[in-house]
């Protein structure tokens, strides 16, 4: 009578039949884990993009002037565009930037980037005005700004008005003296805003109390 039971192989490795199944299980687990990691990375990327979009949406930009300029080089004249851009969040931060490029869009983009590099923080009162009178100068341009009562509005013109509005100032009086150049006027307004101090800061610098400032 023949024995129908399977013959044992002396050279067989114990558990060798389970190795492919175990390897396949590990691969499936890695694929599932990798998928979860990739989904997590994608979600994190979306959240980061959303935050950046919200941060960028707070800022407004206005083009004050676009001019075609030329530069004399060895081969002749090289034409390009220059854009003056004012950037602000209407919450007390504003900047003026200048960008040059071979096309208008590129010049505006560079102007926006330059404006965000030169931001000025403006102290605002509860009536969205400025705390004190201030005077700024740039080149031959001079700008005088003074606080105004609620309901007055922004009494200014040109690039000065753009700077004040994007800074978030709602009630102010401004006077331009000297040059009419938009860039000089905008920069003079920026100088005037950068010199502003709150009453608390002024009292601390002078070494007196707030009551003496208000009196």
Swiss-Prot record:
Pfam families: Ribosomal_S5, Ribosomal_S5_C. Residues 59-122 form the S5 DRBM domain. GO terms for molecular function: rRNA binding; structural constituent of ribosome. Keywords: Ribonucleoprotein, Ribosomal protein, RNA-binding, rRNA-binding. GO terms for cellular component: small ribosomal subunit. GO terms for biological process: translation. Residues 1-62 are annotated as: Disordered. InterPro entries: Ribosomal_Su5_D2-typ_SF, Ribosomal_uS5, Ribosomal_uS5_bac-type, Ribosomal_uS5_C, Ribosomal_uS5_N, Ribosomal_uS5_N_CS, Ribsml_uS5_D2-typ_fold_subgr. SUPFAM superfamilies: dsRNA-binding domain-like, Ribosomal protein S5 domain 2-like. Residues 9-28 have a biased composition (Low complexity). Residues 29-61 have a biased composition (Basic and acidic residues). With S4 and S12 plays an important role in translational accuracy. Belongs to the universal ribosomal protein uS5 family. Part of the 30S ribosomal subunit. Contacts proteins S4 and S8. The N-terminal domain interacts with the head of the 30S subunit; the C-terminal domain interacts with the body and contacts protein S4. The interaction surface between S4 and S5 is involved in control of translational fidelity. This is Small ribosomal subunit protein uS5. The gene is rpsE.
